């Protein structure tokens, strides 16, 4: 009788361990939508002309760990406005994919570019506040931005 129970329980235990092993790494993984928000959203502030803005933000948002991210853009608009871009003008992404969308109106952004000669761990960025249309890649359910593709001057 005890042998019968162990024959049933052993495969069940193996299945439970496999499921836990598969699910556990994804529990701590940041979703693409959350990563987009961490790397690109700064709704609570206006574009800064402070030369230290990008240096501070890139470090604060964990984009200088292990290497210096060469280019990044922060968007200074409400998250809902950026999410709504996913339902605006459809455009082709830089990589050829077809899930990119361009904002109907210009948005306040700050471009951060690694300065020439800057090397990890001393990442130094040039800060450029701008007003431009943004292009984002969207996916998921709900359909939300997961990648900042570009910013453009005009709407054409």
Swiss-Prot record:
EC assignment: the record states 4.6.1.18
InterPro entries listed in its UniProt record = RNaseA, RNaseA-like_dom_sf, RNaseA_AS, RNaseA_domain
- Region Disordered, as annotated, extends over 31-52
Impact reported for residue 111 to E:
Strongly reduces activity towards double-stranded RNA
The regions listed as transmembrane in this protein's record are: none
What is the recorded phenotype of mutating residue 29 to G? Reduces activity towards double stranded RNA
**GO biological process: any one?**
defense response to Gram-positive bacterium
Q: Where is the signal peptide?
A: 1-28
- What does the annotation give as the result of altering residue 126 to Q? Reduces activity towards double stranded RNA
SMART domains referenced in this protein's UniProt entry, alphabetically: RNAse_Pc
What CDD domains would the database entry show? RNase_A_canonical
Q: Which UniProt keywords apply?
A: Disulfide bond, Endonuclease, Glycoprotein, Hydrolase, Lyase, Nuclease, Secreted, Signal
Sorted alphabetically, which Gene3D superfamilies does this protein's record hold?
Ribonuclease A-like domain
Q: Which GO terms describe its cellular component?
A: extracellular region
- PROSITE patterns from the xrefs? RNASE_PANCREATIC
Describe the effect of residue 60 to L.
Answer: Strongly reduces activity towards double-stranded RNA
| Outcome (variant: residue 67 to W) | Reduces activity towards double stranded RNA
**Record field: catalytic activity:** an [RNA] containing cytidine + H2O = an [RNA]-3'-cytidine-3'-phosphate + a 5'-hydroxy-ribonucleotide-3'-[RNA]; an [RNA] containing uridine + H2O = an [RNA]-3'-uridine-3'-phosphate + a 5'-hydroxy-ribonucleotide-3'-[RNA]
GO molecular function terms noted in the UniProt entry: lyase activity; nucleic acid binding; ribonuclease A activity
State the active site: 40 (proton acceptor), 147 (proton donor)
**Can you tell me which residues are glycosylated?**
62, 116
Which pairs of positions does the record mark as disulfide bonds? 54-112, 68-123, 86-138, 93-100
Alphabetical list of PANTHER family matching this protein: RIBONUCLEASE (PTHR11437), RIBONUCLEASE PANCREATIC (PTHR11437:SF24)
Q: Describe the task this protein carries out.
A: Endonuclease that catalyzes the cleavage of RNA on the 3' side of pyrimidine nucleotides. Acts on single-stranded and double-stranded RNA.
Entry similarity comment: Belongs to the pancreatic ribonuclease family.
Name of the protein this chain belongs to? Ribonuclease pancreatic
Q: Which gene encodes it?
A: RNASE1
């Amino acid at each position: 009788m005890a042998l019968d129970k162990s024959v049933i329980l052993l495969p069940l235990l193996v299945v439970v361990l496999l499921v836990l092993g598969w699910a556990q790494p994804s529990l701590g993984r940041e979703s693409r939508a959350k990563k987009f928000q961490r790397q690109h959203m700064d709704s609570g502030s206006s574009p800064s002309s402070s030369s230290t803005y990008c240096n501070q933000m890139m470090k604060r948002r964990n984009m200088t760990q292990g290497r210096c991210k060469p280019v990044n853009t922060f968007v200074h608009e409400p998250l809902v406005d950026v999410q709504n871009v996913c339902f605006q003008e459809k455009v082709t992404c830089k990589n050829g994919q077809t899930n990119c969308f361009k904002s109907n109106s210009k948005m306040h952004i700050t471009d951060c570019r690694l300065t020439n000669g800057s090397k990890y761990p001393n990442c130094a960025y040039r800060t450029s506040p701008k007003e431009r249309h943004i292009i984002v890649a969207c996916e998921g359910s709900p359909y939300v931005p997961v990648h900042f593709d570009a910013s453009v001057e005009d709407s054409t």
